[in-house]
Design a protein with these regions (language model features):
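Short helix-coil transition sites and intra-membrane helix breaks within transmembrane domains
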Residues: 18-27, 168-175
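Generic transmembrane alpha-helix signature in multi-pass membrane proteins
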Residues: 30-31, 58-69, 167-168, 179-184, ...
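Juxtamembrane transmembrane-helix boundary motif
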Residues: 1-17, 36, 42, 63-165, ...
Length: 275
């Protein structure tokens, strides 16, 4: 294995470990790592990041399915919408210069990390997770243990799928920072089920986007394969220590790291920071 491939595998392992420790939203750092670590452009990094995040999320989703905590109908619905929207994001990405893509990614990363930071701060202050909305359009039927499918529920999940799919194709993000808050806001699922269902959506949408990128001839497998394998290995190893390290303090550290990465990415794109 070449030095470049080893570096890619090492960076992938970092992403896998972050996913294991911080949850489904941790994969958003994959693209900045590829840009900084391997010198790729945004368009080159996006499908590689999705490949790694998709495979790592697949591992988590399979484990969730075995535990019976994945709402597979909701996951399939959201993912189906996302897969349909991802090619539009990919089409837009290839028609935008690197600068606006990098700046847009930086803004999305700042937004996502800002939400994580706020949530962690509230949890530390209150000693428990922040309260959820009183009205939720998607609620479990206690008799069947399944979500009640109503028009408001379908509308909320459709919007979630559209946004996550568009961002997946456009920026190469799995969409956990969209899906997890949406499921927390619109459903009364418990946190474990929300994360597991989100991982299933991320896996399906990400891998669907990777297939689209491969068919378009823009997937660099020589870089993507070691990076993805490293991510899966990092996820498996990270899960061994996740229960001992995970918590609001770790979420704060992740959010601050993400904010710094966003600022560095924007600064590099604007020429304010030397490559």
């Amino acid at each position: 294995m070449s030095e470049h491939s080893l570096l890619g595998a090492g960076l992938g392992a970092i992403i896998g470990a972050i996913l294991a420790l911080t949850g489904a939203g941790g994969g958003i750092l994959a693209v900045p790592l590829l840009v900084f670590g391997l010198g790729l452009s945004m368009v080159e990094a996006a499908p590689i990041g999705l490949l790694a995040v998709g495979l790592a999320a697949s591992v988590g989703a399979v484990l969730g399915l075995r535990q019976g905590i994945v709402r597979y109908r909701a996951a399939g619905f959201v993912a189906g919408i996302g897969i349909l929207m991802a090619p539009l994001g990919l089409w837009l990405a290839h028609r935008l210069p690197n600068l606006p893509l990098a700046l847009l990614f930086s803004l999305v990363l700042l937004y996502a990390c800002g939400r994580i930071l706020r949530k962690a701060r509230l949890e530390l202050k209150q000693g428990q997770p922040a309260p959820r909305p009183a009205f939720m359009p998607c609620v479990l039927n206690p008799a069947q243990g399944r979500l009640r499918w109503t028009l408001p529920c379908a509308r909320a999940l459709t919007f979630t799928g559209m946004l996550s799919g568009l961002l997946s194709g456009l920026l190469g993000v799995g969409g956990g920072f969209v899906i997890i808050p949406a499921l927390s806001r619109y459903t009364n699922l418990d946190s474990k089920s929300i994360v597991a269902t989100s991982l299933a959506v991320i896996a399906l949408v990400s891998l669907g986007s990777v297939v689209t990128a491969s068919l378009s001839g823009i997937m660099h497998w020589a870089v993507g394969a070691p990076f993805a394998l490293g991510a899966v290995l990092g996820l498996v190893l990270g899960r061994q220590v996740a229960s001992h390290l995970a918590g609001p303090r770790l979420q704060q550290l992740f959010a601050i790291t993400g904010i710094l990465a966003a600022l560095l990415l924007a600064g590099g794109a604007l020429g304010l920071i030397a490559p």
